[in-house]
């Protein structure tokens, strides 16, 4: 999560980049204006400032569109039904505060005591999705101020879904949060809990999740072939924690060891000098740590402990082919990066060595969170930091860096593009946006990259997320000059792209209130935009842009029928779907055309000719069928 300074509101560029104006105004061929009316947007985040003008009713400024808020931190109020912690507040209480019926009767409702999410994140996210100047300005909001524990996030999802079910309304839930600490194949205890909650209401419920901001952090190591000759890389920090996904067939065939080096570390220059080896563990396998945790004390020449290496392997999760394996190094250093000058004494360098057969994937867990006094880093060039040169060095990279829950199969994963590279303040002075590196419309290079360990493309779709100006609480105490009473802030990240997508989904659910996640995903991915920037990383779909850029007007105005078993008023039957070999079409038609989701014509067949999909790669395709009554379309999924 990245934060910027207060500036004037300039959200209109996100609306322009996502082509939402035509949907909000009902421009032809759209049958009416769609604004998110009667749709609920769930914001599971740091909370929301209920007094902000962005969340009022556009026709009555005394009315608030926030139906309820569950603060999981607050134990002063009434607990919500079905949950044993936190406090719940309601629309009437918010309106009483807004209109002066009560005064300061409620606690601050956009608040995170851990500082992990900062202050204002939830309000900003909610403004993008459902503010009066946001994507769905008439949607209602249910917010959760979450404690960041995985189980609490799942509880928050259930809270929103339960409320929407009781009210009989469709809902889209925004998750601008996540973690790298998982198997990256969509399995695990939390993934299963998440799946069970989402499946409680399959119709009219969609979850959008941010792909994460680790796309240029070099946090992934692995996915290369192993042999009896060791390969190695370097890490340093306090602590160093690597999470591995290792196939169940390889947990006794891959071995690891750790080498320690000590010397002088310059935090400001990020370099080591005078390094000497001070410790080396024995080789150990993940299987050997299933029953008994591995622990090794790395000692300096004087006998003092320099670092403690620990390793543990969990049992295989149901539905996964991988084991969750962790190597953690407690460097025993004296660090506090919150003070000035920063204190980073006793930092050592560690080399992770690996040999065996097959492949593995691993992720360096980041601890450089807002308010944290620690850090962890990978090494892409040993010579740049003063590390020993080795011929078997393998640098970490940026693939496989999408976070959970975005990589869960029950979500739509959202990456970020550049919304603006500069802005004008209230005096008309132009400033470069804080994180701007690339032109408007190009990829936000921090966006987490795919694929997943089980081979799925990530992210799935991209929306504006770098340098977005939107709502912030009036009590926000961040850096920068406050304008408009301090109620707008510039932020960057996939956290900002995700609510743009969630707001777009709210417009879709207003039109199709019983649409399923699969139907929503298919329509959005089949109607993305491809341009000169998406071409930078090859043909779509790919693991940088997914299926392309969000264009909600294209989705609403030209969306493809989502009854794929029949086309054109039940005149043409198409089966099977998904298909692996021959596709059957029954009925009176003249011609079939197969298109990629980017609109490229791939094949043409006349009636009576066999349409074989056996040679097509797995993925989504568009089938257009010419009949005497007209031309109709359907989505076809190829799955071998």
Language-model-derived ranges and their functions:
Residues 1-40, 47-62, 421:
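Autoinhibitory propeptides
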Residues 48-123, 267-378, 382:
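Active-site core segment of subtilase-fold serine proteases
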Residues 87-116, 313-318, 383, 417-427, ...:
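Catalytic-core environment of secreted peptidases
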Residues 126-130, 142-154, 158-171, 230-232, ...:
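Hydrolase catalytic cores
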Residues 166-186, 204-213, 217-220, 224, ...:
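C-terminal subdomain of the subtilisin-like protease fold in secreted/lumenal serine endopeptidases
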